[in-house]
Amino acid sequence: MQALEERFPEVRFYNPALIEVQDDVRIGEGTRIGSFTLIHAGAKIGASTTIGSHCNICECSIGDRVSIQTACHITRGVVIEDDVFVGPGVITLNDHLMNGVLCAPRICQGAKIGGGSVILPGIVIGERALIGAGSVVRRDVPPGATVVGNSARPTIAKHASTTA
């Protein structure tokens, strides 16, 4: 088997002996991948993306300038657009009934997902949306919204009142 550095000369692998990249994987220039990470066949990873250690990246599409922190599971069919942040320990799911009918989440450009969150099958997280740490996302999140909790709900904006 060809060494990772030879297959992907423009990618930085941290401790490549402890990383497995299966066949038919595309990884963009300037991407960095942490140790103990598995990248499954068919995965497409954009340029200047960072994937932390202990991640499982299934057949999915990850955009440019994405940051996926340590211990994340990105399931088959997920689409992560450009400039997304995925906190440590985030899990995406793609099968509601465990019957093989896949319906993966989509995470739109500029979204930020707090650590330990779970994104259920078929969910769309809108552009620039923010998911609070530890949230369970069961419904689509509109662009620019902030949701927190289990089940994730929109936050209420609190504004300081001013007196004259």
Task: Label every model-predicted segment.
Residues 1-8:
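Long, charged amphipathic helices and adjacent flexible linkers at domain junctions
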